[in-house]
């Protein structure tokens, strides 16, 4: 019997799985003392952990400390609950897991084996408690897929039907923007896979700096999200500074894509990732065209990882 496929997108800003709401890539270790408020609490290896809105500093290699391992255990527990593998009132769960994950295409060669060691732990039994449910899992396999490529898996038939010679997959994430070029035949052009440090976190930093310099106020990522996406208006002047700074950042990002040879006029652009969703109105105004694809589900990569892992397991069992 195949293990249960759990897909986790370990982003620099958010952790995503196919069936749960994204949660912030932030963690507090309370040591051996349980926190006063126990929502979203994990007990692992004698330490209590809770989620926080403060994000972990950017890590090129997420296997260098314990943070993303613990975040992934929380994601696995949340996903199993959302998928119905934990019944109401159930206190113990035992499950073998195939963990489907992703990396920027340019990082896979260097980091895929590290992910296998770090998250797989040689298939050893892992015991933890999440929200008063005891989990015993074995990660019997780790599969690593290319970000961006995974996200478009459900849309490939639509993309393949396009008349353009090339499609660019532009994944604006937390810290990086990853660009993958496809030929019309669906082949990835490995000579053009770019990853550069112009993600949405840098935009937050620029907005925070502008607000601090102008108003001597500190705004966090979630306040900025609330202003840009949800219509929150903390006052005309502050609102204008946030929107103007974000617009300038998005324009610079689009122009930097053009500078590295991404042709957004003759190709078919596909935008994915939380940064694309956040900056969508500005990106659309900069494109100057109305035939493009925005994949507006921030969980798209996680959904793609799950599809690709299940497809691989099915093929192996034939």
Map each language-model feature to its residues:
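Nucleotide/phosphate-binding catalytic cleft detector across ATP-hydrolyzing
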Residues: 1-167, 186-202, 222-271, 276-318
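Acidic, metal/cofactor-coordinating or nucleic-acid-engaging core segments within structured domains
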Residues: 211-215
């Amino acid at each position: 019997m195949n293990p249960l496929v759990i897909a986790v997108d370990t982003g620099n800003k958010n952790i995503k799985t196919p069936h749960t709401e994204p949660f912030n890539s932030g963690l507090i270790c309370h040591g051996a003392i349980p926190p006063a408020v126990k929502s979203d609490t994990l007990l692992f290896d004698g330490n209590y952990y809770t989620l926080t809105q403060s994000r972990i500093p950017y890590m090129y290699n997420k296997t260098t400390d314990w943070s993303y391992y613990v975040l992934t255990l929380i994601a696995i527990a949340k996903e199993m609950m959302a998928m119905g593998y934990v019944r109401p009132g159930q206190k113990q769960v035992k499950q073998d897991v195939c963990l489907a994950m992703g990396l920027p295409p340019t990082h896979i060669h260097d980091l895929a084996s590290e992910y296998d060691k770090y998250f797989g732990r040689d298939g050893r039994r892992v015991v933890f408690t999440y929200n008063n449910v005891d989990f015993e899992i074995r990660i019997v396999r780790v599969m690593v897929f290319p970000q961006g490529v995974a996200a478009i898996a459900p849309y490939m038939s639509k993309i393949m039907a396009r008349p353009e010679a090339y499609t660019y997959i532009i994944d604006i994430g937390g810290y990086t923007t990853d660009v993958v070029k496809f030929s019309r035949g669906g082949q990835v052009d490995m000579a053009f896979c770019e990853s550069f440090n112009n993600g949405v976190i840098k935009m937050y930093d620029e907005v925070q700096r502008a607000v601090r310099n102008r108003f001597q106020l500190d705004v966090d990522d979630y306040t900025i999200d609330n202003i840009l996406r949800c219509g929150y208006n903390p006052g005309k002047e502050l609102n204008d500074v946030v929107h103007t700074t974000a617009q300038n950042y998005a324009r610079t990002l689009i122009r930097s894509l053009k500078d590295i040879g991404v042709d957004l006029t003759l190709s078919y652009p596909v935008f994915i990732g939380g940064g694309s969703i956040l900056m969508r109105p500005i990106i659309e105004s900069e494109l100057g065209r109305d035939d493009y694809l925005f994949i507006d589900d921030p969980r798209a990569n996680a959904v793609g990882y799950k599809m690709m892992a299940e497809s691989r397991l099915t093929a192996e069992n034939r």
